[in-house]
């Protein structure tokens, strides 16, 4: 979809929503913007890994370098601090002082909630409790988890649904959502992950559709546009994954206009999180390019 067609579609949608009386509801979470922009910490994973920047400075970098006031954490950058109240308090203080928001924690290296081994699955569930509590303390709405599994199509649905359902019993008790990203294996198959969502069938369990993470394995890819359509009905967050950009400022692997069309058509009114993962541009440049593209799309509506 080109920009002209996107503008026409967006104008029709926003006009129709206003006439129906639903427009104010759709936009209320975004201060009269069709969507707000957040920054995922993974966008700076190389700098963080090299200790060029400190995790505690992430929110300040988002605000001061990019004008972004909402952040999404990755647990591996403060992996030993989930139960460190002093550290979490410092994180919270810095975000509050900036007038920013903590949205979610992306959780990795804690096991797979769909593990076919009952003991490993139970351990993975338990491993996520501390991150659920940390998310609550920081003011986040969700933790992002991995539902990777093994076995047949149906077996993996049942296993992943079991792990999510059991973890959600804890998350729901303290008001934290449990959301699944398309993150490899069958989780990158939109039809499969949608089936998992239907199987769990709980308002606090949802998806985090990622524009680019539709690689199932090796050279096997799921159609990203079809996948986004299938996952958006359950979305509680969205990741604008980006890699490289052309001379016009467009992302070369994903048609951002087309995907944002899908996102808005689903009635989504939350944050769209920048998640730059490219190698041609520096991380700072990649974040700026992604931010600029999302702003152009937003301003076109």
Q: Where are these predicted regions, by residue range?
A:
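N-terminal pre-domain/capping segments
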Residues: 2-137, 155, 172, 202, ...
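Short, conserved glycine- and acidic-residue-centered signature motifs
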Residues: 55, 124, 160, 224, ...
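Acidic/histidine-rich catalytic cores of soluble enzymes
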Residues: 70-71, 164-261
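Hydrophobic residues within beta-strands of alpha/beta enzymes
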Residues: 71, 103-105, 143, 178, ...
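A short helix->loop->beta-strand "cap" motif at the edges of active sites that frequently abuts
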Residues: 100, 176, 266-270
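Active-site groove signature of glycoside hydrolases
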Residues: 135-154, 179-183
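Active-site cleft segment of glycoside hydrolase catalytic domains centered on the general acid/base Glu
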Residues: 150-164
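Conserved active-site loop/cleft motifs that coordinate metal ions or position small ligands
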Residues: 240, 270-277
